[in-house]
Curated annotation (Swiss-Prot):
It is found in: Cytoplasm. GO terms for biological process: proteolysis involved in protein catabolic process. Belongs to the peptidase T1B family. HslV subfamily. The gene is hslV. It comes from Thermosipho melanesiensis (strain DSM 12029 / CIP 104789 / BI429). The keyword Magnesium does not apply. A double ring-shaped homohexamer of HslV is capped on each side by a ring-shaped HslU homohexamer. The assembly of the HslU/HslV complex is dependent on binding of ATP. This is ATP-dependent protease subunit HslV. Disulfide bonds: none annotated. The keyword Protease applies. Na(+) binds at residues 161, 164, 167. The lineage of its organism: Bacteria, Thermotogati, Thermotogota, Thermotogae, Thermotogales. Keywords: Allosteric enzyme, Cytoplasm, Hydrolase, Metal-binding, Protease, Sodium, Threonine protease. One of its GO terms (molecular function) is threonine-type endopeptidase activity. Allosterically activated by HslU binding.
Amino acid sequence: MKWRSTTVVCVRKNDSVVMVSDGQVTYGNTIMKGNAKKVRKMGEGNVLAGFAGSVADAMALFDRFEAKYREWGGNLLKSAVELAKDWRTDRVLRRLEALLLVADKKYTFIISGTGEVIQPEDDIASIGSGSPYAIAAGRALLKHTNLSAKEIALESIRIASEICIYTNDNFTIEEL
């Protein structure tokens, strides 16, 4: 059986950075849990981080990312690149199945196990199975409304939760 994914969304607008995730954990065709916390603050509250994929793998990556963040003196870009390099080259890390979404006041990055560190070209990023729906909704809301970052993030993931069967409407919100 396969663990199915989730949806995590990050929206930047004005001086606000908001990350929201759903709470559903799905194994095969069964919902195992509906209130998992998939986003958190790290780096003394200066960084938001969320994950999609295997929970145990993501926790290991959270810990590694936080160590890299401390090692590089709070430089999010360098921390993301160094984690991606380790993730790609280390035999044990290479087997971890998760994606990380990290953001601070300046940057947002998606970090993958294949070595990618992707900075979105606009002010919204998303990972997980509901990501395409959340991105589409978020881009439209950013472009055509005056909603806040928090309102856009929540509406984007709410729309994704109505379409993606691996995403529920039990949201966790973190803000910078």
